[in-house]
Amino acid sequence: GVDADLIDPDGYYYPVTTTPLVLMGNADYDNMPSDWTDLTKDEYKGLYQLHNLGGGTAKTVFASIISRYQDPDGDLGISDEGWEIAAKFLGNAHNIADGEDAVGSVIDGTYPMDEHWASGVLTEQKDRDYKFQIMTPDIGEPYVVESLAISAGTKKYDTCVAFLNWLGSSDVQLDWSNNYGTIPCQKEALDQVSDDIKELMETLKPQDLDWSFIAENVDAWVEKAELEYVQ
């Protein structure tokens, strides 16, 4: 079975894997924030790295922050406070440039924090023989769910269903996880994943996000942010 919280409420998409988006930190860094919004404080200026807002990780993290400040009368549906948070969050960050070793910068302390996708954190820990700190906000982390859907009107509906049932089976999902470090949505597979995935997932929980509101506005939010706030 699959966690009901991960299923598309309209029933169009079949969830396969999930990717929590996290802030990882240098193992010895002693001032880890408790939430993304803490990074707006002056004490964190120049100490964390953000990816380009055009990418999925950065865009989703950004949306998960400012969507907390919904205001129907605000600019693009966001309150003045929300845009102040956005300006400080983006302005305090080091923007990762092409070719930079962002993970290496976390390890050597140049920039002791970095936004990252959870499976990537696990891969980097294994490849670099290093254990990162992970921020765990009370509000939870934004989860991205990789899903598949069947095209309307297909003449091979039964074949598609069989493929989805095969791909989503516990055996296939566990094998995929063991080979590529993915985090399965399938509960039986998740119960059998490697210890490092289990350990990480036990500390994380999905943030409750208004995905419809985000989908309607995120491109406009990113455009405004890139024009006005990204340093």
Predicted regions and their residues:
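Ligand-binding "clamshell"
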Residues: 1-10, 124-136
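Extracytoplasmic ligand-binding site segments that recognize negatively charged/polar headgroups
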Residues: 1-110
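Periplasmic-binding protein-like
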Residues: 19, 84-89, 96, 128-152
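A residue-level marker of the well-folded mature domains of exported/periplasmic proteins
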Residues: 45, 68, 94, 124-134, ...
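Short, hydrophobic alpha-helical packing/hinge segments within bilobed ligand-binding/sensory domains
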Residues: 102-105, 121, 160
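A ligand-binding cleft/hinge motif common to bilobed small-molecule-binding domains
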Residues: 107, 113-131
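Mature extracytoplasmic/periplasmic domains
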Residues: 141-142, 146, 151-209
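Extracellular/periplasmic bilobal clamshell ligand-binding domains
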Residues: 193-231
